[in-house]
């Protein structure tokens, strides 16, 4: 049985407000790409997986290259994604890049969610 704590609602409200401020979904990103909005899409998966398919226009920046900050921009939003919902590599990258002053969001669900939504895949 789940315990309910007083104050949980306020914590939950803050959590979801923060989550919405720093995550976006694949359909929204696809719309931004289609409208040629000024965003940078960063794929933090391994290079071999990036080559098999990725979000159109994405830049591959695997973990071993995070220190280079290659492709990141300070003047626009950098949208980070990894493999799937249970992959925390995107969140780790976003934290590291944000700590260095880059505006970041994470794509909810990773590349798996992109594919599940039937969106265009680049190779």
Where in this protein do the model-derived segments appear?
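Short amphipathic alpha-helix with an adjacent loop that forms part of the alpha/beta core around
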Residues: 32-33, 66-75
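Short loop/helix-cap segments at secondary-structure boundaries that form the rim of catalytic
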Residues: 50-56, 69-73, 114
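Flexible, polar/low-complexity N-terminal or interdomain linker segments that lie immediately upstream
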Residues: 1-40, 45-49, 123
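Glycine-rich, highly charged phosphate/nucleotide-binding loops
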Residues: 59-67
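Short, hinge-like loop/turn segments at secondary-structure boundaries
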Residues: 59, 77, 121-123
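Short active-site oxyanion
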Residues: 36-41, 56-57, 77
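Conserved beta-strand scaffold positions in the cores of enzyme catalytic domains, especially
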Residues: 41, 58-60, 104-106
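Catalytic cysteine-centered active loop of the rhodanese-like fold, especially the PTP/DSP P-loop
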Residues: 72-115
């Amino acid at each position: 049985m789940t315990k309910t704590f007083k104050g949980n609602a306020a914590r939950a409200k803050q959590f979801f407000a923060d989550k919405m401020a720093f995550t976006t979904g694949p359909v929204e990103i696809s719309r931004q790409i289609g409208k040629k909005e000024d965003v940078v899409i960063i794929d933090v998966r391994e290079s071999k997986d990036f080559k098999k398919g990725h979000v159109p226009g994405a830049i591959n920046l695997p973990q071993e290259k995070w220190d280079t900050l290659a492709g990141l921009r300070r003047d626009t939003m950098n949208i980070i994604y990894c493999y799937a919902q249970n992959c925390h590599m995107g969140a780790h990258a976003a934290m590291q890049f944000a700590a260095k002053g880059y505006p970041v969001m994470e794509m909810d669900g990773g590349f798996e969610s992109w594919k599940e939504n039937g969106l265009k895949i680049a190779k």
